Amino acid sequence: RQMCIRDRFRDAHFYLIHRFLHFKFMYKIAHSVHHRNVNPGPWSSLSMHPIEHLLYFSGVIIHWVILSHPLHATYHLFHAGLGSANGHIGFKQMMINDKRAIDLSNYNHYLHHKYFEVNYGNLMIPFDQWFGTYHDGSKEMHEKMLKRVSIKN
């Protein structure tokens, strides 16, 4: 049960911190370092300003709120550090053989690096769908994003 709570907290924490990092002042001083990788690869996942590292890994504080085993906190840190590489590979599917493939959510984060204004979170909790920042790569979603960005600016 604690692992499930931790995973949902991590998803929410990532989305909220990521949105915060896209505020103009935070983007300029910290998050722009990460977004130099417009076509990201696994090693670019932790290419961040030190301020962003502090914010990104601050999610481990949940283990002081919901008392948990030290292995849970260790898993949390490993997942945050190593799991982010998987989120930056940019592939939509992993091919099993000629006829089978597994859908990945990594493509969504690739679109985030391409357009900056979409897909701040992952697909486990649909924050992007709820707040109108989701982009699936389709022409319709691209038009919706352009309209939203033009209103914002």
Residue ranges and their predicted role:
Residues R1-I5:
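Short, small-residue-biased leader/transition segments that mark boundaries at the very start
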Residues R8-K28, H69:
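Transmembrane alpha-helix/helix-exit interface in multi-pass inner-membrane proteins
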Residues K24-N153:
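Cytosolic/stromal cytosol-facing helical appendages immediately following the last transmembrane segment
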